Amino acid sequence: MSLDQFVTGWTLARFEGKADPQPRVFEQWIEFSTPFSNLPLVQLGLVGFDIDNRDTARLKVRAERITANGFMLVLETWRHTRVYGAEVSWLAIGT
């Protein structure tokens, strides 16, 4: 799944000119094509990214609020880092 600065709500490329210690977060709900009977295990992988080369690259990727129907994909950066895009793969395992 590819996400970038043209997706509504993307704030990871925004930098106001000071090293704000507060993280910038982007969330995207991922709906499973078929619901699981039980809570699945969700594995994420960062496949690629587009990050400004002027500063240190900082990017966290995690799954939150996992249900039988889907999960919230969360991308987070902080300080000077500007993230213009990220590609994430995911796998949900369960019954």
Each model region followed by its residue ranges:
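Extracellular receptor-binding modules and their adjoining Ser/Thr/Gly/Asp/Asn-rich linkers
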Residues: 1-38, 47-52, 57-60, 64-95
